[in-house]
């Protein structure tokens, strides 16, 4: 396979770092982004990019086009999570969540699409989440941001189909990455007597599942397959088998049963 010019956001750690390394090892020319200056990862060229800043995004894409002449694959991986009750989240917390996880994806796509349209080819891989299929308690705005990515990607795939541009969604379950330790916790939730106990029980379960989750190379391997395939599937679920099967069951399981199962799993009582 001809080496691809690939840009992956959020490549300084976790999924992004491992996936960038794996793609580079396969012979692709890989650029990674991070919000802060970061050393190159092997042959992966790191760029300082704030995905919430359209000017920063556009400058990075223009630099790659200037150096390589094209953009073959964009992987929107940059993301963050805020834990807490929906009612108590501040406007600043909600904006931070949506700006990074959703509008960051929008900014990146808007920057690369003119070049992909001109070339009449390209591939955009948006990292969503199983939390983008079902609302996770005390991760509500994270789920909302991923639901937004899902809807955006569905519409985008239709709009860019005439230009032979593929849009794909990857829905990870729980993986053992630095995401757990980097989660932002809303202080107001822990201080509220009505929510505190329920929140702490659920958070303990969430963090345990993440720490016992799959190795991130499993996700990296799935992304590498999508990059390699001419006609990849629109959606790919990756993670612990139980989580993948549960997410798939939403399409046929009655809503009240799904809600009941989630309450039991996350100790909502």
Swiss-Prot record:
Listed EC numbers: 1.1.1.102
Reaction(s) catalysed by this chain's protein: sphinganine + NADP(+) = 3-oxosphinganine + NADPH + H(+)
GO molecular function: 3-dehydrosphinganine reductase activity; NADPH binding
Keywords, sorted A to Z: Lipid metabolism, NADP, Nucleotide-binding, Oxidoreductase, Sphingolipid metabolism
Keyword rRNA-binding: no
Origin: domain of life: Bacteria
Residues that bind NADPH: 10, 12-14, 36, 50, 142-146, 175-177
PANTHER family: SHORT CHAIN DEHYDROGENASE (PTHR43976), SHORT-CHAIN DEHYDROGENASE_REDUCTASE FAMILY PROTEIN (PTHR43976:SF16)
Protein name as it appears in the record: 3-ketodihydrosphingosine reductase
Organism: Bacteroides thetaiotaomicron (strain ATCC 29148 / DSM 2079 / JCM 5827 / CCUG 10774 / NCTC 10582 / VPI-5482 / E50)
Gene name of this polypeptide: kdsr
């Amino acid at each position: 396979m001809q080496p691809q010019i690939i840009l992956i956001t959020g490549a300084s750690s976790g999924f992004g770092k491992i996936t960038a390394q794996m793609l580079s090892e396969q012979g692709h020319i890989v650029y990674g982004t991070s919000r802060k200056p970061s050393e190159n990862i092997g042959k992966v060229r790191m760029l300082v990019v704030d995905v919430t800043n359209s000017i920063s995004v556009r400058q990075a894409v223009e630099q790659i086009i200037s150096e390589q002449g094209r953009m073959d694959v964009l992987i929107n991986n940059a993301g963050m999570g805020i834990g807490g009750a929906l009612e108590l989240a501040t406007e600043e917390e909600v904006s931070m969540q949506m700006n990074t996880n959703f509008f960051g994806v929008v900014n990146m796509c808007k920057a690369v699409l003119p070049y992909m349209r001109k070339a009449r080819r390209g591939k955009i891989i948006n990292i969503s989440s199983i939390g983008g299929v079902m609302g996770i308690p005390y991760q509500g705005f994270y789920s909302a941001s991923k639901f937004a990515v899902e809807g955006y990607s569905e519409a985008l795939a239709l709009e860019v189909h005439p230009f032979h541009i593929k849009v794909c969604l990857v829905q990870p379950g729980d993986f053992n990455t630095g995401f757990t330790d980097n989660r932002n916790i809303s202080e107001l939730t822990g201080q509220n007597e009505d929510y505190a106990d329920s929140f702490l029980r659920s958070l303990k379960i969430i963090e345990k599942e993440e720490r016992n989750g799959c190795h991130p190379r499993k996700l990296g391997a799935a992304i590498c397959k999508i990059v390699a395939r001419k006609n990849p599937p629109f959606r790919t679920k990756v993670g612990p088998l139980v989580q993948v099967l549960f997410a798939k069951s939403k399409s046929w399981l009655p809503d009240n049963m799904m809600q009941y199962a989630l309450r039991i799993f996350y100790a909502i009582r």
